Amino acid sequence: MVDLLIPGPEGTIEAKYSHNNRDDWPIVILLHPDPTKGGTMHTKIVFKMYKIFIKAGFSTIRFNFRGVGKSEGFFDDGEGELSDAACVLDWLQQYNTNSKICWVAGFSFGGWIAMQLLMRRPEINGFVLSLIHISEPTR
């Protein structure tokens, strides 16, 4: 595992990356839950997904959205976080040019961002969404 600071739209983005030794193996980007509720790339479920994807042979990256950990910037209600995810995906693809398989996985808020990224990036051909929270029920 390598600690990274990736140039992002609002400054650097803190990330953890594990590269598979074969350049043509699949890649995956993992997205964490709501930063305003304590979500980080170290959240238990995100960390477990990270280990599972590595074991499955993926080159795997998880990162902190803007304003979390060492990532610069401020929470942007999803718009900026989508830009962060796109930037990290660009970085991942740049270092894995022979990979034909690209996945995105997200937990809660990260799942919501993952769905948006999936709709905008046709090269993504696999995804995992966990516990998507849309809104509070009305009474």
Residue ranges: model-predicted function:
Residues 106-114:
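Gly/Ala-rich beta-loop-alpha elbow adjacent to hydrolase catalytic centers
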Residues 22-58:
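Short, surface-exposed "cap/lid" segments of acyl-processing enzymes
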Residues 34, 64-69:
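Short beta-to-alpha linker loops that shape the active-site pocket of alpha/beta-hydrolase fold enzymes
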Residues 123-132:
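A conserved short beta-strand
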Residues 1-23:
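N-terminal cap/lid segment of alpha/beta-hydrolase-fold proteins
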Residues 132-138:
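Residue-level detector of conserved catalytic or cofactor/ligand-binding positions
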Residues 97-107:
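Alpha/beta-hydrolase fold nucleophile elbow
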Residues 76-95:
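Alpha/beta-hydrolase active-site loop
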